[in-house]
């Protein structure tokens, strides 16, 4: 990853820190493919760039498979946010303003190594990745291996296991969608615990739906997203009241 200003590429084990602790994971970061930005483009355009793919010799077909997967997930994620808009009694295209024609979306391939036997005997709870919220609109997690470890936090602050179910994706709400829906769609706090000793590595493939880097959120009222119907916001207020006034589930 250090070879590219796009932050796309490979990250070694234990290279990141979340909530003050080292994450025990290694990963590849990819995105829907884009050319290098033109000279004079804003610095944030460096995020839109070609991927650093493994060689075809080392992993035959890898690039084609994941390019196709990102294309299909891109289409599905746009359709999904259209359904969210409809569910909130907004126009189906309420979110379209925030997508480029060639919108960049991102994908990770993540490996979480198992705890060592010594750590497990000492009662260590390994941090695969610490508690956090995704920043984008929505994310879609494919749990590749049959490992527990993914947990989500409910409004009471309790961590709930999210075990893998074959043939399904785990969908999470990101902070951008929470902002666009005036808090009706609450972003999901989640974490991953390291696999138990001897169980092998946990593998997962999260896909992150992006938004335009130059989107202006002060234009909400013009596109309808800012005009969330009062009855929808009232449902959210009732849930907050039911949970003792708690409006943020972050406990880290």
Residue ranges and their predicted role:
Residues 1-252:
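Peripheral, non-catalytic segments flanking oxidoreductase cores
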């Amino acid at each position: 990853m250090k070879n590219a200003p796009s932050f796309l590429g490979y990250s070694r084990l234990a290279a990141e820190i979340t909530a003050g602790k080292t994450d025990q994971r290694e990963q590849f970061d990819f995105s829907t493919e884009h050319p290098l930005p033109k000279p004079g483009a804003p610095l944030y355009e460096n995020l839109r760039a070609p991927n650093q793919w493994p060689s075809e010799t080392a992993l035959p077909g890898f690039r084609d498979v994941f390019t196709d997967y990102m294309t299909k997930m891109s289409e599905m994620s746009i359709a999904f946010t259209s359904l969210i808009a409809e569910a909130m009694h907004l126009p189906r295209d309420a979110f379209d303003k925030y997508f480029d024609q060639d919108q960049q979306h991102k994908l990770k391939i993540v490996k979480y190594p198992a705890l060592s036997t010594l750590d497990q005997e000492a009662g260590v709870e390994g941090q695969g990745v610490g508690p956090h919220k995704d920043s984008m609109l929505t994310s879609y997690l494919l749990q590749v291996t049959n490992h527990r470890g993914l947990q989500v936090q409910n409004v009471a602050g309790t961590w709930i296991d999210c075990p893998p179910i074959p043939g399904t994706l785990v969908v999470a709400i990101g902070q951008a969608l929470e902002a666009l829906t005036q808090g009706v769609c609450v972003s999901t706090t989640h974490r991953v615990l390291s696999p138990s000793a001897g169980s092998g590595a946990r593998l997962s493939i999260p896909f992150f739906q992006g938004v335009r880097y130059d989107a202006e959120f002060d234009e909400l009222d013009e596109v309808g997203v800012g005009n969330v119907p009062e009855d929808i916001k009232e449902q959210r207020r009732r849930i907050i009241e039911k949970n003792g006034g708690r409006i943020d589930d972050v406990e880290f």
